[in-house]
Regions:
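Generic detector of short, aliphatic-rich beta-strand segments that form the cores of beta-sheets
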Residues: 159-162, 294
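Hydrophobic residues embedded in beta-strands of well-ordered beta-sheets
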Residues: 108, 120, 167, 227-230, ...
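Histidine (H) residue identity feature
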Residues: 31, 45, 74, 176, ...
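N-terminal start-of-chain detector that recognizes signal peptides
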Residues: 56, 79-84, 93-95, 133, ...
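Solvent-exposed beta-strand/loop surfaces of large extracellular or lumenal domains
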Residues: 135-155, 260-292
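Catalytic-domain carbohydrate-binding cleft regions of carbohydrate-active enzymes
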Residues: 2-156, 163
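Accessory, solvent-exposed terminal regions and/or long lumenal/extracellular loops of proteins
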Residues: 162-264, 273, 285-286
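Solvent-exposed beta-hairpin/edge-strand motifs
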Residues: 125-139, 248-267
Length: 294
């Protein structure tokens, strides 16, 4: 019930922040009972609709991860997002934390909830593995766990931090209706500092055919080390709509010497434009400190 189920419509900033939080919820719906033209719809906030659209578009982008987490919740009851103290139980500093949460296992969400806020303090929980780090989702800046960082924010901001070991599948093609559209270009963000795995789940999204095996579970496993190894293992008979895959691997140290797929070296591009034009290959972004593979 984004915006409130009944009562007066919220002011624009509050509505934007409400949407920015709601996009990570299992059920996301903007509606109310009002019939007197005070119903909370995005187009009622003409000066804020850009930020509302950006947030909703981001939820669509995250839909491969969201759907996979929903299937996991169905199987074992683990919520798609949890308070930080549930994930980092050995860090007492998280016990009083009541706003930030983990979306899945590896994405820390720190929504802006104070009116007019320009700086958002974010506590990055301590981890048991000393090799783990947190990375700003947007800039890829690296942070050690167990500290509070100050994040500059504006009305468009949704502060996010990627935890070491993250495997976050996203849609590389724009989506607007999941009943009629599918992810055809799969983008996977990884932070391969530590060993990790994530199971991407797909089915037709409409029927119960998955009960008869019409699903596809793709286990994506990362083996960290001097040589990073990523493996994909499939289970199920559902035919995926994915036609292309793009890996974005946070690699802070330096560019790798080579990248192989099934034992065959991919071409290395020094210029991003040529990489974007190529059908396959890899490129190292100095700005983002990441290896980009397709």
């Amino acid at each position: 019930d984004i915006g409130g189920f009944f009562g007066p419509a919220p002011e624009g900033e509050l509505f934007v922040r409400w949407v920015q939080n709601g996009i990570f919820q299992p059920r996301f719906s903007i509606h109310s009972t009002n019939t007197d033209n005070t119903v909370t719809e995005p187009w009622m906030y003409s000066d804020k609709k850009q930020y509302i659209k950006e947030a909703i578009d981001f939820r669509y982008k995250l839909s491969p991860t969201l759907y996979s987490l929903m299937e996991r919740a169905h199987e074992n009851g683990l919520p798609i997002w949890q308070p930080t103290f549930a994930v980092f139980q050995n860090d007492p500093a998280t016990y009083d934390e009541g706003v930030d949460f983990m979306f899945g296992d590896s994405l820390l969400v720190a929504n802006v909830v104070e009116k007019g806020q320009t700086v958002r303090p974010v506590y990055l929980p301590k981890t048991e593995n000393e090799n783990e780090r947190f990375y700003d989702f947007y800039t890829r800046e690296e942070y050690a766990p167990g500290q509070t960082v100050e994040v500059p924010v504006d009305i468009a901001s949704i502060p996010l931090f990627v935890r070491s070991g993250a495997i976050i599948p996203m849609s590389g093609n724009a989506l607007h209706n999941l009943m009629t559209e599918k992810t055809t270009a799969l983008d996977i963000l990884m932070a391969p500092d530590v060993d990790s795995a994530f199971t991407l789940y797909e089915d037709d999204g409409r029927t119960n055919d998955y009960r008869n095996g019409a699903y596809l579970k793709t286990k994506i496993a990362v083996k960290a080390g001097v040589k990073t190894v990523v493996t994909f293992t499939n289970e199920g008979s559902y035919e995926t709509a994915v036609e292309s895959m793009y890996l974005d691997m946070i690699h802070r140290e330096k560019s790798p010497f080579y990248v192989q797929v099934d034992g065959k070296e991919l071409p290395h591009f020094l210029h991003r434009r040529k990489f974007e034009q190529a059908e396959s290959g890899w490129y190292y972004s100095q700005r983002l400190k990441s290896v980009q593979i397709k």
